[in-house]
Swiss-Prot record:
Highest rank taxon of the organism: Bacteria
Pfam families: TatA_B_E
Source organism of this protein record: Shewanella sp. (strain ANA-3)
Name this polypeptide is given: Sec-independent protein translocase protein TatB
Transmembrane segments: 2-22
Annotated localization: Cell inner membrane
Biased composition annotated in UniProt, kind: Low complexity: 113-133
Biological process (GO), any one: protein transport by the Tat complex
Function: Part of the twin-arginine translocation (Tat) system that transports large folded proteins containing a characteristic twin-arginine motif in their signal peptide across membranes. Together with TatC, TatB is part of a receptor directly interacting with Tat signal peptides. TatB may form an oligomeric binding site that transiently accommodates folded Tat precursor proteins before their translocation.
UniProt-listed HAMAP family: TatB
GO CC terms: TAT protein transport complex
Length: 147
């Protein structure tokens, strides 16, 4: 990192920093500079990894096109391995989006409108108490009715 800077130059920078910032603020400044350098290194490494991944994907696409043009029968082992990797990647991408043909019973939506026809004809629905049958109750148990 400090290829062109020797020990004397680093010592001079340290002394100047001590004079300019003082002994109280110099450690804080050094920590903030090192954290900035770490953040820049992390960002550079992540960009590098993303570019390598994109180049690998482009190489797989190029290998696939090359294999299609040659025909899939006479391929080199490297090319066959690249095609297999590409097929596995395509299957792993498509796998989460597959739709099941038959939904499970617990996943079905309950539709009360379809059952209303069957409950109207059942005898238990006609034996339910109505407000007219409750009128004959004793009013002594209800203090508001006595008033």
């Amino acid at each position: 990192m400090f290829d062109g800077i020797g020990f004397m130059e680093l010592l001079l920078i340290g002394v100047l920093g001590l004079v300019v910032l003082g002994p109280e603020r110099l450690p804080v400044a050094v920590r903030s500079v090192t954290s900035w350098i770490r953040a820049m290194k992390r960002m550079a490494n992540s960009v590098k990894e993303e570019l390598e991944q994109e180049l690998k994907i482009e190489q797989l696409h190029a290998d696939l096109k090359k294999a299609e043009s040659k025909g899939l029968s006479n391929l080199s082992p490297e090319l066959q391995e690249s095609i297999d990797q590409l097929k596995q990647a395509a299957q792993s991408v498509n796998r989460p989006y597959q739709v099941q043909d038959v939904p499970a019973p617990e996943n079905q939506i309950h539709n009360p409108a379809s059952q209303s026809v069957s409950t109207e004809a059942s005898p238990s629905a006609s034996s339910a108490p109505t407000s007219e049958s409750n009128q004959g109750e004793d009013t002594r148990s209800n203090p508001k009715a006595n008033g």
